[in-house]
Amino acid sequence: MADKKGSNSEKLLYCSFCGKSQHEVKKLIAGPSVFICDECIDLCNEIIRDEAAAAGVEASLSKSDLPSPQEIRDILDQYVIGQERAKKILAVAVYNHYKRLKHLDKKDDVELSKSNILLIGPTGSGKTLLAQTLARLLNVPFVIADATTLTEAGYVGEDVENIIQKLLQNCNYEVEKAQRGIVYIDEIDKISRKSDNPSITRDVSGEGVQQALLKLVEGTMASVPPQGGRKHPNQDFIQVDTTNILFICGGAFDGLEKVITDRTEKTGIGFGATVKSKQERDAGEVLREVEPEDLIKFGLIPELIGRLPVVATLGKLDEAALMKILVEPKNALVKQYQKLFAMERVELEIRPDALQAVARKAIRRKTGARGLRSIIEQALLDVMYELPTLKGVSKVIIDDNVIEGDGKPLLIYEDTPKVAGSN
């Protein structure tokens, strides 16, 4: 090892890579007939880190590390309550997708096509949460896009390539990582065609967007502006291949049950036919019978439906499921609020009758699991406002009267119980 300092009688040594002399660098390390300086070593380490990050995507998705469908399902169970069939369908589809990516380099006569996913279910049934959990489990870049904000290129609004730009932003513009990420497109049903017949006028937020999405979903080279840039003609773009990006599209598809029912009732005619009345059939049961022709009649173009071969339907969450959602998942709402209260050194108890009241209120509002937080937040608002200034409170108890707005939380002091807001 040669130090920066050296006598004039010594032969001057140079880095074999950058050409700097030993006096221009801090350290010069000698090898067999070559030298390398500390600056070149730092540069090498940076290159290795960048390449390792890109290779890490492939390494994390190698066969040995890729969780099996059962393992994927087990992890989904920790965060998502109910929707058992949808979780099984998703687990198999995601496993097959990343297994396919692993075998892309192998030459084979059989080419495996991509299994993009369509999730159909009411608001608050867990569509977005399922997609988020999958991305976190697989450690891949993930982005949520709202289909209602998209328009055809050239019109006011976001064009579909903005989705890929957001995906790049989420992985610090590492193209290799982005090309193996997951894109969740929400409200896909809101860009359905306005009628069964192709329109003679431009439908820039409906069928036009579906056509633009089609190219992205099936695989294309998307041109994305550089980091922090906006699109303009004289600009170099980042090229992102969307062929191996997994697209998950979700929507409530209000009215699809009627389309399915109309079709099934037409076929269920005859002496031996057993036709249930509309009242007897559960909405989730009807949705499970969805066929491509139903989605076409609803307003999706056939080409886009063909690129979403895996269809998973989610049912409405009942009272029991909503109560479980409040307490069972790893990041359950009750656990979150208990942690917030624990930061004030106060124990929070939400009684079973209160949980039931929260679930019933969410069902009345038709908000599903999505509405649970606002109900609890509203019930706890006053006590969370007062708690930091109250002295000696050790526990807060919430019952059904608090949830319904007919009572106030019970505060347990170190000495005696007291109702919040009372003097």
Curated annotation (Swiss-Prot):
Any one GO CC term of the record: HslUV protease complex
Q: Name one Pfam family in it.
A: ClpB_D2-small
Binding sites annotated in the UniProt record for Zn(2+): C15, C18, C37, C40
According to the UniProt entry, its GO molecular function terms are: ATP binding; ATP hydrolysis activity; ATP-dependent protein folding chaperone; protein dimerization activity; unfolded protein binding; zinc ion binding
- Membrane-crossing ranges are none
Can you tell me which residues bind ATP?
A: P122, T123, G124, S125, G126, K127, T128, L129
Which PROSITE patterns does this UniProt record tie to the protein?
A: CLPX_ZB
GO:BP terms for this protein?
cell division; proteolysis involved in protein catabolic process
> Which UniProt key words apply to this protein?
ATP-binding, Chaperone, Metal-binding, Nucleotide-binding, Zinc
Q: Where is the ClpX-type ZB domain?
A: 3-56
Q: Does the keyword Metal-binding apply?
A: yes
Q: Write out the similarity annotation.
A: Belongs to the ClpX chaperone family.
Primary role: ATP-dependent specificity component of the Clp protease. It directs the protease to specific substrates. Can perform chaperone functions in the absence of ClpP.
Per UniProt, subunit arrangement is:
Component of the ClpX-ClpP complex. Forms a hexameric ring that, in the presence of ATP, binds to fourteen ClpP subunits assembled into a disk-like structure with a central cavity, resembling the structure of eukaryotic proteasomes.
Name of the featured protein: ATP-dependent Clp protease ATP-binding subunit ClpX
Species this protein is from: Burkholderia pseudomallei (strain K96243)
